[in-house]
Amino acid sequence: MKVALLGAAGGIGQTLALLLKLRLPVGTDLALYDISPVTPGIAVDISHIPTSVSAVGYSGEDPSEALKGANLVIITAGVARKPGMTRADLFNINADIVKNLVEKVAEVCPKACIGIVTNPVNTLVPIAAEVLRKAGVYDKRKLFGVTTLDVVRAKTFTSELKEKHVETVKVPVIGGHSGPTILPLLSQALSEGLPLSFTQEEIEALTYRIQNAGTEVVEAKAGGGSATLSMAESGARFAVAVFKALLGEDCVRYAYVESKEGSGYPEFFAHPVRFGLTGVEELLPIGKLSEYEQAKLGELKPVLEADIALGKNFVNP
């Protein structure tokens, strides 16, 4: 079984490559690809770490060698956010990069699952879907946007606010993966399986912080980058869990995937997902929303729908 990481020389990619080398199951092949000539060296560097995961690096314009035989492709390639940039500003550059990479996936390993980390996820996942459709290989079970960082942040910030042990806290996060489209369901937040209670002021402040945590990091790094380390850790959590699901382990994670037709949600939406041998096996119920969450859902839908339309129109002008 093989994982291909596209964008392996970037700020997220290098750390994610290290974490995958440490955490993927014994015997996994890890292929690292980036346009940068340092990529084979990154593979050599992590190959000195004593785990039973083999790493090989590829550089240049063509990722085909890295993609051959891949079961799971993780895409982190693209430019990072800088101060003053929104995720939408990234679109013009990253849309082309992801489109070209997904075209290669469609050609070389059309049955592989694809996890997109590159922002703006809301728009790039629909681009990938359209590219795969055009190639005649689209399978909605095998394409997902990685929104794990939103769940990780919700868990961390909630545990800090409520002074609970972070490992005991669970907070669902649905919607999209940009500012106002990120919707933490604090009404369903649990610690040690028991509901947590919040004042309205806490709900609003915590929701705002989770939605804008990416900007918090960009500003704190003072022009020196975006959230690379927490994103790499979140990406590793997701990739390893999904890869193990492809091997038969039970796995439920939140991810930005194609919604059920007639569900009332936008065409792509972050749901709780059961992953299995074929990728997405089941979209699980989102559960009951509070009045505040229902209002927020109503606000985010048109924003997310516009993001999705932007992606589809990019491939089909």
Swiss-Prot record:
The active site is at residue 177. Keywords: NAD, Oxidoreductase, Tricarboxylic acid cycle. Signal peptide: none annotated. Substrate binds at residues 81, 87, 119, 153. InterPro entries: L-lactate/malate_DH, Lactate/malate_DH_C, Lactate/malate_DH_N, Lactate_DH/Glyco_Ohase_4_C, Malate_DH_type1, Malate_DH_type1_bac, NAD(P)-bd_dom_sf. SUPFAM superfamilies: LDH C-terminal domain-like, NAD(P)-binding Rossmann-fold domains. It holds the Pfam family Ldh_1_N. GO terms for molecular function: L-malate dehydrogenase (NAD+) activity. One of its GO terms (cellular component) is cytoplasm. NAD(+) binds at residues 7-13, 34, 94, 117-119, 231. It is an enzyme of class 1 (oxidoreductase). The keyword NAD applies. It catalyses: (S)-malate + NAD(+) = oxaloacetate + NADH + H(+). Its EC number is 1.1.1.37. Catalyzes the reversible oxidation of malate to oxaloacetate. Homodimer. NCBIfam families: MDH_euk_gproteo. Belongs to the LDH/MDH superfamily. MDH type 1 family. This is Malate dehydrogenase. It comes from Actinobacillus pleuropneumoniae serotype 5b (strain L20). The gene is mdh.
